């Protein structure tokens, strides 16, 4: 079954109802919006959009951490994830919110401190706070990709 969503980046689109995720507590700062669609702009892009189903202007660019850094492990207690049906963050899919400066796209950063954990089986998600003090809210993605590729050589 498809659902119609109005978005600013893509206009009015149809998404499969399986792409709709419930966030029981919303996202930090946007608690009143508890339903989002995970939209893939293109198969080649490492980025996806987390688009509110209720507010066309509310969308976040997200990325999975393993695409630009090694061994990201959020410091989250297992109890924090029980309300979305997970016993550990390792059982979920992790996304990080990306910020892209208008004047410097190469300066794009990911928020390591506020990971979004998804339970794909139940269609639920939650934004948590990682208590690891080394997790920056502005981890440079391009620099991290370059570091990761130089480690493989």
Curated annotation (Swiss-Prot):
A single BP term in Gene Ontology: regulation of translation
Residues annotated as transmembrane: none
Pfam families in the record: FliW
InterPro entries: Flagellar_assembly_factor_FliW, Flagellar_assmbl_FliW_dom_sf
Keyword tRNA-binding among UniProt keywords: no
KW 4Fe-4S (keyword) present: no
Cell compartments where the protein resides: Cytoplasm
Origin superkingdom: Bacteria
Subunit structure comment from the entry: Interacts with translational regulator CsrA and flagellin(s).
Summary of the function given for this chain in its UniProt record: Acts as an anti-CsrA protein, binds CsrA and prevents it from repressing translation of its target genes, one of which is flagellin. Binds to flagellin and participates in the assembly of the flagellum.
HAMAP family to which the protein is assigned, alphabetical: FliW
UniProt name for this protein: Flagellar assembly factor FliW
Organism the protein comes from: Leptospira biflexa serovar Patoc (strain Patoc 1 / Ames)
